[in-house]
């Protein structure tokens, strides 16, 4: 098995880490940053940008720049969460043929899993550049409160990106691994994870290398994006009051506001007020308009108070489910960029009645934990046992539209549970198994994971046939269900890929597309490198001709200048062979110039220098070869 990387696939930012010499190391990307914006953009020329470069051009290309796609993954288009996101997103969200949410960009539809896979490819490349080897195996994190559809879609994204996803691990559990790996004492901890788009709270018991999740809860549609939106709404209304102009329909202005809101939110974590100054935000008949609004920390906290209040319910439920009170918790670990906000920290203190622990990097700790889990799976990290739980109850629909639970929430996974059911009518030849996930008592109020039929039941009075339904949840939290007629031995099973989601055929197609796109990216990179190399050479030779051109004859000089012109023309085109050929021609043409340069340089360094011993260039007798380099270096300097 090769190296296993750990990826925190975040709503706002993503991060990748790997085990190096027994320790987890966070890997910086090409731009030198340890986190990468989870943003994908599609340019007019057909180029695909991922990360910081995509974020930088978002203002001028907002309709084709996709962000926060994690909030859409594994969700139905008609869900209230997707409809809300659709109302505030500059890019187009539409309904896929299977009822899922999809994104439409430049005339093509993309599933959220496909967009996520593009971010994963960037993280994979970041790791490959650092490690100098091809990576195929990964551990990817998801919010603990993600349902089966969202987990499956995340796994699909990994597959499309060319990754073998060894494990899907919950973000708070990963953070607990990173926090507790070197801890020797037994303790009960709460991991409070508020990120860009999701909120999780997990209660764990740590001791002797065992990380046991006692309960988990959360909200998969609550995070920094919602806080930003409250600030944006405030700025829009203030600007309308001040200037009488509503800028909600101006996508470019809204993108500038989004960036300003995010920046202001961050600044207000350390200062009491900030100025939001956006010149030329819009214009009317009287001329350009500028936005200049002062935002205080108190005003911002008032704007987001309702969101902060929503953090308490899941925490109380998680404590209750774990059978603990706040005073039983030894440490509260803060995870996710939003936990830097002073009001959030204050809320955590109010809920748990203690100061939260701030000793981990909230942006990196999840990726670090994922890398540790990779180390556990690869055998590099010993004596660590992770016992995670399923966040939501699982069951089937029974007579009267009731949900009968087979596996209760917070059951340790992997797990398997069977229960015997029967028919509801005489001579019923088949039963339809409607698989559900959720906590409500009626089937219609819960999420449908899938349906399948067990057919060929022999005629019998109702209540006589015995049908055994078995639920199996693997270590990734992904569900498999089977139904067996104990009388005939007939069995029918499905691996739940949700009532929608991508089919295996669609995934394979997207994998092939991603591979071909990878080849395109490689060719583009080669072209850019060839252009840069040829351009740099042309510049260097041009500079030398100005300095040493009088040392070669006019015909030779004209030949070199002609070769430079050919290089300049070639780099304007897209033919890599033409660029390389022009560069080779310039290399050959500039040989005479190079000889003239070296001849002049060697003459300049021939005479003895003051204070040097006898011999050329001040080299004393018996000196080592490397000393020649030192002497020449000193002389040139």
UniProtKB/Swiss-Prot annotation:
The modification Phosphothreonine is found at residue 198. Keywords: ATP-binding, Chaperone, Nucleotide-binding, Phosphoprotein, Stress response. Induction: By stress conditions e.g. heat shock. Residues 597-637 are annotated as: Disordered. GO terms for molecular function: ATP binding; ATP-dependent protein folding chaperone; unfolded protein binding. It comes from the Bacteria. It holds the Pfam family HSP70. Residues 608-621 have a biased composition (Gly residues). Residues 627-637 have a biased composition (Acidic residues). Belongs to the heat shock protein 70 family. Acts as a chaperone. This is Chaperone protein DnaK. It comes from Syntrophus aciditrophicus (strain SB). The gene is dnaK.
């Amino acid at each position: 098995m090769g190296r296993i990387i750990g990826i925190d696939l975040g709503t706002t930012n993503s991060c990748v880490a790997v085990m190096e010499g027994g320790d987890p190391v966070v890997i910086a990307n090409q731009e030198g940053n340890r986190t990468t914006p989870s943003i994908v953009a599609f340019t007019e020329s057909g180029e695909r940008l991922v990360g910081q470069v995509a974020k930088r051009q978002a203002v001028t290309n907002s309709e084709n720049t996709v962000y926060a796609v994690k909030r859409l993954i594994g969700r139905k288009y008609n869900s209230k969460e997707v409809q809300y996101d659709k109302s505030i997103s500059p890019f187009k969200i539409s309904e896929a043929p299977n009822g899922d949410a999809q994104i439409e960009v430049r005339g093509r539809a993309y599933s959220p899993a496909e967009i996520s896979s593009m971010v994963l490819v960037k993280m994979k490349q970041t790791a490959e550049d650092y490690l100098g080897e091809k990576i195929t195996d990964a551990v990817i994190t998801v919010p603990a409160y993600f349902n089966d559809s969202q987990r499956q879609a995340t796994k699909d994204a990994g597959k499309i990106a060319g990754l073998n996803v060894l494990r899907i691990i919950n973000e708070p559990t990963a953070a607990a691994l990173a926090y507790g790996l070197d801890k020797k004492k037994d303790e009960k901890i709460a991991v409070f994870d508020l990120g860009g788009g999701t909120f999780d709270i997990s209660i764990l018991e740590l001791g002797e290398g065992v990380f046991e999740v006692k309960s988990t809860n959360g909200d998969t549609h609550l995070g920094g994006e919602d806080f930003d939106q409250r600030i944006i709404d405030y700025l829009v209304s203030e600007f309308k009051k001040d200037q009488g102009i509503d800028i909600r329909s101006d996508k470019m202005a809204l993108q500038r506001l989004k960036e300003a809101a995010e920046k202001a939110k961050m600044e207000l974590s350390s200062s009491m007020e900030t100025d939001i100054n956006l010149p030329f935000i819009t214009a009317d008949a009287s001329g350009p308009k500028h936005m200049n609004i002062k935002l205080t920390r108190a005003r911002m906290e008032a704007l987001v108070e309702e969101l902060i209040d929503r953090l308490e319910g899941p925490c109380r439920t998680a404590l209750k489910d774990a059978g603990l009170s706040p005073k039983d918790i030894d440490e509260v670990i803060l995870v996710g960029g939003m936990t830097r906000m002073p009001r959030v920290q204050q809320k955590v203190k109010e809920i748990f009645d203690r100061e939260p622990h701030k000793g981990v990097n909230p942006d990196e700790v999840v990726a670090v934990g994922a890398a540790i889990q990779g180390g556990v799976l690869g055998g590099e990290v010993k004596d660590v046992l992770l016992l995670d739980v399923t966040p939501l109850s699982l069951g089937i629909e029974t007579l009267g539209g009731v949900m009968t639970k087979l596996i209760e929430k917070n059951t340790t996974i992997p797990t398997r549970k069977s229960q015997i059911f029967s028919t509801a009518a005489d001579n019923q030849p088949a039963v339809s198994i409607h698989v559900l996930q959720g906590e409500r008592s009626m089937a219609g109020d819960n999420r449908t994971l899938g349906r399948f039929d067990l057919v060929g039941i022999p005629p019998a009075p109702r209540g006589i046939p015995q049908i055994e339904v078995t639920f199996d949840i693997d270590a990734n939290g992904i569900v498999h269900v089977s139904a067996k007629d104990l009388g005939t031995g007939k069995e029918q099973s499905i691996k739940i890929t949700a009532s929608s989601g991508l089919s295996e055929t669609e995934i394979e197609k997207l994998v092939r597309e991603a591979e071909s796109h990878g080849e395109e990216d490689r060719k583009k990179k080669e072209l850019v490198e060839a252009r840069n190399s040829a351009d740099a050479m042309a510049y260097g030779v041009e500079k030398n001709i100005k300095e040493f051109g009088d040392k070669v004859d006019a015909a030779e000089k004209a030949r070199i200048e002609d070769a430079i012109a050919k290089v300049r023309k070639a780099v304007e085109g897209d033919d890599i062979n033409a660029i390389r050929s022009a560069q080779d021609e310039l290399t050959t043409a500039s040989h005479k110039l190079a000889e003239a340069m070296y001849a002049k340089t060697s003459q300049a360094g021939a005479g003895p220098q003051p204070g040097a011993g006898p011999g050329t260039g001040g080299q004393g007798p018996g000196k080592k070869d490397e000393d020649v380099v030192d002497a020449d270096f000193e002389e040139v300097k």
